[in-house]
Structures are given as C-alpha cells and as structure tokens.
Amino acid sequence: FPDKDIIEFPFTEEKMNLSGALFDKDKLHNICKNELSKLSEEELYDFLYDWAKENEPEYVEKWFGDREKMLQILRLYMGVGAKRRRKDLMYAKQIFELISYFFDGESAEEMDEFKLDEDMVSKILKSYLAKYDHNDDNSVWFNKLKEIADEHGFASDMKAYKANPENFKGNVSDIAEAVRIAVTGRANTPDLWTIVHIMGEEQMTERIKKHIK
C-alpha cells in the first residue's frame, strides 16, 4: 500500500489508455443519468447548490434565493417525487441551461422563432392577457386558449381541424405555442400552466408584453 495521501499523486492521462471505459463519455453520461434519477428532492437540490457554489458562484443567489421555487422547478423538470423520473439529464450545467428561463436576466441562448407572424402573435398575446386569471386551474386556463383560438380563426376542436384544415389559420396548439415562446423562449417545454405558476403572474406578464406591438 502507498504510504502517502492520494492528493500527493496528481492525476495525469499521459500513461493511461484513453480508449478505456474511464474516458468513454457515452458510458459516463449513461451512469450519470441513472444516478441523478435516483436522487431525492433534497439530494438533487443540494447537489446542484454545491455545483453552483463552486462553478457559478455569481448565480447562486439568483438560482437558490427562493428555495421553494427551485424545488418546484426540479419537480417539474426532473419528476422528483413522481412515479416516473426523467432519465435524460446528465450533469448540473445541462440542468441549469434547461431551466434558465425561469430566472430574470437569463434566457435560452437562441430564442425559438414564432411560427405565426408578428401581428397575429401580438393579437393572441393581447387576448391571452385580457383573459388571464392566475387563479384558474389548468382546465379553465386551457379552455381560455380555445376561446382565443376561436376568436382569431384557429380551430379549438382538433377533430374539426383535421377534417378541414383549410378552414382555419391553425389550431389551439398554435395559440399555446405562441404563449409558450413568449414566456419561455422555447417551443417545447413541460406543462405551460405549471411553468407560469412557478414563475408567477408578474414575471409571465412582463415577458409577454415584450412581444405585444
């Protein structure tokens, strides 16, 4: 056995086989995905906090200043506490990049483009804010998206849209996508109703107003 502490033996790749399993990123990432999915809510929170404190100390207060907000985000994105856990996230930096839009001053590196033209997006977002009530549950909230669809010539009924798509400008999913991109900068996210309730009405409204002409 060596008689010196391990820290006195600096790690070097020079005499190692770089094609071995230790340097196989795919295998390493696969292990990380599985291990992250096993962490409890508190363990995952602590893991991310420790990583941020060491690697991104300037963001610690922003990310972790509201403990309950971060826990809600992790429940949504990682499935913490749910029957099915998300198993495609591999490391802390990836997770923070994914959830960055929840925090003011941060956004996706490249905002996804709206499929609809600016005028239509503006009209949809105006209607959305006019009808929005933060106390609405998910069902009532989505029914209001359907109302907006009908008001602007989009199909609220997917069966009707599939039967005669030429009769409509689009469907209710296009309405939801316009709101989603305005709020998060991304066309694909987890449940939008949950996202806006984690963010809060004020933050959501400020972001939407930036896209209203």
Residues covered by each model-derived region:
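Catalytic adenosine-cofactor/nucleotide-binding cores of aminoacyl-tRNA synthetases and other
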Residues: 1-110, 114, 184-213
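Long, amphipathic alpha-helical coiled-coil segments characteristic
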Residues: 113-157
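Charged substrate- and nucleic-acid-binding regions of tRNA-handling and nucleotidyl-transfer enzymes
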Residues: 146-213
